[in-house]
A protein has these predicted regions:
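Short, histidine-centered active-site or binding-site loop motifs used for metal coordination
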Residues: 38-40
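Aromatic-residue-lined binding/catalytic grooves and analogous aromatic/hydrophobic interfacial grooves
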Residues: 26-35, 52-76, 80-202, 308
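Elongated scaffold/linker segments in the mid-to-C-terminal portions of large proteins
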Residues: 125-297, 304-306
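Conserved, well-structured interaction surfaces
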Residues: 1-29, 42-53, 59-74, 263, ...
Length: 308
């Protein structure tokens, strides 16, 4: 007997991961080499249409074999493994851009599979503010596998500062967007709760303008910016460690190398909403919610808008 005969569910999970990787290849590059088995021969090149057809067939085939759509916390068995909701989410992504991939739109199917996620036991996380951290912030914190936010996590990539130490994943997302002055903690503690502040990526003015359309963004730290914007998502920091203002815009192309040219983005952190310490001083505990229920709502909104 093959492994597929012995454990149908795990085999379906592995096939999902293969499909997800092929989806990204197709989406990013178009025509890509395709193979379903290890071989010394060069893999044949598939067109986007061929890849789309494979992905649709593969996901529809494995969906009934995956576990029931069930949100979990890090203490639950199976946390981090995909279930039916992940297949629905990937199908909705595939159908949303079907016109680009194949020439034929599939808005109805995109809406249908997004709705399956929306109607499942996975939900948008709307929990109470904890120690000053909003429900939105709790999605991107060091205890997001424990604080209740994982009810929204259709496919979490597990992180633990001791057990999965990595310079990539969520450590990159927080370290690359912080310098030592960025202050998002409601208690006024600067930084992201790791030792890493690489001062790299930051916001363009056009992003700030979405939250402050009247060009009136205040020069405050991120822990005050959300109140000024009236929006929990406005996690921008406008002050440097020495109290000097960050420039809201990069006026010249040669200024993009200076981190203070642009507001910092303080979305991902390694703080724990319950106030407990991180597991490691350097590496991140923050799970990466690669697929979130919020995406299903956005997909459904776009698909139905284009349908109508």
């Amino acid at each position: 007997a093959t492994f597929a005969d012995v454990d149908e569910t795990k085999t379906a999970e592995v096939r999902f991961l293969r499909a997800l990787n092929y989806y990204h290849l197709m989406d990013l590059y178009g025509n890509v080499p395709f193979t379903e088995q290890v071989s010394a021969k060069a893999a044949p090149q598939y067109t986007r249409k061929q890849m789309y057809d494979f992905l649709e067939k593969e996901l529809l085939e494995i969906e009934p074999k995956l576990s029931a759509a069930t949100p979990k916390k890090s203490t639950d068995a199976g946390y981090g493994r995909v279930d039916k909701a992940a297949a629905w989410m990937l199908l909705s992504r595939l159908y949303l851009n079907a016109q680009v991939y194949t020439g034929t739109p599939q808005w109805q199917k995109a809406a249908e599979y997004a709705k399956k996620v929306m109607d499942s036991n996975y939900k948008l996380y709307t929990g109470a503010t904890k120690n000053g951290w909003t429900a939105y912030q709790q999605l991107f914190m060091g205890d997001n596998g424990e604080n209740g936010a994982s009810v929204e996590a259709v496919f979490p990539i597990l992180q633990d500062g001791k057990k999965t130490a990595s310079w990539g994943s969520t450590l990159f997302l927080m370290a690359s967007t912080f310098d030592a002055g960025v202050t998002v903690n409601p208690n006024g503690v600067a930084g992201n709760n790791t030792s890493e502040n690489w001062a790299g990526n930051r916001a363009r003015k056009s992003l700030i303008d979405k939250f402050f359309p009247n060009n009136n963004a205040p020069y405050v730290h991120a822990n005050q910016m959300t109140a000024a914007a009236g929006d929990d998502r406005a996690l921008f920091d406008a002050l440097q460690a020495d109290g000097n203002k960050r420039n809201i815009d990069q006026a010249n192309a040669d200024q993009t190398g200076v981190f203070s040219n642009g507001f910092a983005v303080a979305k991902f952190t390694n703080f724990h909403s319950d106030g407990t310490a991180g597991h490691d001083a350097k590496f991140s505990d923050t799970d990466l919610f690669l697929m979130r229920v919020a995406e299903a709502y956005l997909t459904y909104a776009e698909a139905t808008a284009r349908l109508n």
